[in-house]
């Protein structure tokens, strides 16, 4: 009886964790729900700087699409987190060489309360290089 209850509890916990799973595509689909900051930097300047900034933070670029202005980033599991998925969305604003950068940060598991919100550190690093609007 105890074994059956334990297995039921274990299956329920697994289902709960799996139901909150986030993929890199989910982070991209959440456009508009991240932290948005505008910078005095051309799209080209921002695009060429972002991989360096992400590397400094220990993040790995999983895929990029310059035409869409999308960098998809993954951070593996650690002692404190099951990992994170981050979408960095870059778009041109106006004709004066300004860009809008949105960072959407999601835990790899929806129930992952200790996942890092990468928006703040990414925007802090970018603000060291470019002036915010």
Language-model features, listed with the residues they occupy:
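N-terminal export leaders
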Residues: 3-7
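Hydrophobic helical h-region of N-terminal Sec-dependent signal peptides
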Residues: 10-15
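Ser/Thr-rich, low-complexity intrinsically disordered terminal regions
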Residues: 22-133
């Amino acid at each position: 009886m105890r074994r059956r209850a334990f297995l039921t509890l274990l299956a329920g916990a697994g289902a709960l964790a799996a139901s909150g799973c986030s993929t890199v595509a989910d982070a991209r689909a959440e456009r508009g729900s991240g932290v948005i900051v505008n910078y005095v930097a051309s799209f080209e300047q921002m695009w060429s700087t972002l991989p360096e900034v992400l590397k400094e933070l220990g993040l790995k670029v999983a895929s990029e699409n310059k035409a869409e202005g999308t960098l998809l980033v993954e951070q593996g599991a650690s002692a404190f987190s099951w990992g994170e998925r981050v979408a960095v969305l870059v778009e041109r604003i106006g004709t004066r060489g300004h860009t809008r950068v949105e960072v959407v940060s999601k835990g790899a598991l929806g129930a992952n309360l200790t996942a890092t919100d990468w928006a703040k550190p990414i925007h802090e690093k970018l603000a060291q290089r470019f002036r915010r609007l």
